[in-house]
């Protein structure tokens, strides 16, 4: 049991490090609220962050298997992002976290 907990802790640590990066949860929240494919500019506008930060976080989410990136051969280039099945599986946990944050915001106002 201890070995299993140790293995799980390593994976949890990895997830927490990734999710604690600037704007990572914001991007997941925005994409969670609107399951339709989203373009980079729409995510950037809704998250209100720099292009560099959004691009890095989307690349990290894609590398972690939480976001799909689909590029179209258009001029100018069109790229759409969607949540993967793994990210959708995280939705209940993220919803609980976001609900907790909103409830705390109501209490501290």
Task: Tell what function each PLM region has.
Residues 1-7:
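N-terminal intrinsically disordered/low-complexity leader segments
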Residues 69:
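Short beta-strand "wing" residues that participate in macromolecule-binding interfaces
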Residues 65:
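Glycine-centered, phosphate/nucleic-acid-interacting loop/turn motifs that mediate DNA/RNA or nucleotide
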Residues 73-94:
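Basic, amphipathic "hinge/linker" alpha-helix immediately C-terminal to the N-terminal HTH DNA-binding motif
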Residues 7-12, 29, 89-109:
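Amphipathic alpha-helical dimerization/coiled-coil segments
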Residues 54, 58-62:
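Basic amphipathic alpha-helical segments that dock to polyanions
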Residues 10-53, 74, 80:
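N-terminal helix-turn-helix DNA-binding core of bacterial DNA-binding proteins
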């Amino acid at each position: 049991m201890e070995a299993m907990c140790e293995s799980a802790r390593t994976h949890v640590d990895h997830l927490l490090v990734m999710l604690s990066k600037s704007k990572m949860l914001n991007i997941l929240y925005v994409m969670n609220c609107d399951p339709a494919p989203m373009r980079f500019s729409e995510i950037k506008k809704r998250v209100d962050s720099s292009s560099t930060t959004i691009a890095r976080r989307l690349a990290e989410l894609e590398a972690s298997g939480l976001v799909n990136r689909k590029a179209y051969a258009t001029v100018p280039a069109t790229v759409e992002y969607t949540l993967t099945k793994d990210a959708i599986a995280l939705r209940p946990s993220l919803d609980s976290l976001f609900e907790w944050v909103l409830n705390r915001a109501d209490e501290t106002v």
